[in-house]
């Protein structure tokens, strides 16, 4: 099938963050506060590539690329499909290094490891310093100690995990009644002081049906506002702690962590995510009568730590000052090992550099690999990059980020001028061979490259199957076994082909 241009429906991480702050602003003015996967076609043989491409494009002029450059893209695509590099790198990151929370020893080890791997490929490596949060999880336990029709002398375990940045409970924990609401509107409708001195649970359900239709980002955006704004809203209502129903589709009593937020204008209260199963239990019991929970969280926040974005340049032959960014974020949450979020994005970006090296392909412009630091806790690495390179936006020809897992890619998101869609058609024709030919316009393509997008740099991301991503996202199940090797190589092919296309085009991408 030829290139198809549609409107992007996924909510990017940048958009999700915007949604969160819009919801937060709305929450602060509430009345009560003022009172499995699609198979990809086999790639065509190199010998008949050019004729097949011409047929796919229906005679459309290839525009920015010569037939030889299009053939080079096909070589990159095909080589990626049999290349074990990304999978081996991901195995090392997740097994040998493990979770990479910003400020942690593992994050520091990952920086050094990735830098060494890029040097081994002949890239010019720079470690650009950024101050990042240093938050450590600690103990996290909860038990129901009183509930309707309780068997005398018993308690019930509640499975939860602290939200990123949460403050601690007192050392001996908090014991308080639980109030359950599904949304901010239900909270606003409660009598005054109904939550004061109690633990508040926001029980907003993740829309699994929407996610199953391929709109995982939309489903995530509907729930993440409670994780983000919940502590502020609950504290202003007088709660002593806040719980949120996990934002994700996991079934096996697995909690989803994620960053939360506080305001200096209200008391900072402990915050945790409970599993969907435990949220259902709490709602059921609370409807029958008083429910009392004992909660212990012992996270610690230390002074910001020094960390680094790993930047590796494969220098261009004609315009080395012009760069094309290919990237993922190196940090991860600490419950799993950060395989799909976002080890996969890092290693497919590494493979883009490795493929150019292996195939001895030298684009006109510099291909810049970036492993961003601290995306999960505030995108401090990306913010620092924008400070360090604020005067160089004109020389950023394009930016690519992969941060939606590693499932089968169906095409490319692009943000920028509408003309980018037609400009990319020949590239989509190359990617048709792996079922990744769709072109989708989107306001944003990634959290870490959002600053470049806002400065007019054309930006891109793989369009990925998101039906299953939020089952594992931010959970203990985000591990190496969730990554399909074939799909990982398909994503690497998209990243590498697109990076080469941007870096070697006869005319730069429209902007």
What name fits each language-model region?
Residues 19-31:
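Bacterial N-terminal signal peptides
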Residues 45-69, 91, 95-212:
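Noncatalytic luminal/extracellular "stalk/propeptide" segments of secretory-pathway proteins
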Residues 63-104, 254-259, 331, 403-407, ...:
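N-terminal capping segment at the start of a domain
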Residues 72, 147, 159-192, 260-339, ...:
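Soluble metallo-hydrolase cores and metallopeptidase-like ectodomains found primarily
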Residues 73-80, 95-105, 180, 213-231, ...:
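Second-shell loop/turn segments in exported
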Residues 81, 119, 171, 176, ...:
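Metal-dependent peptidase/peptidase-like ectodomains
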Residues 88, 354-380:
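Short helix-loop-beta-strand segments that form the rim/entrance of peptidase-like active sites
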Residues 354, 358, 470-511:
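His/Asp/Glu-rich mid-to-C-terminal helical/loop segments that flank catalytic regions of hydrolases
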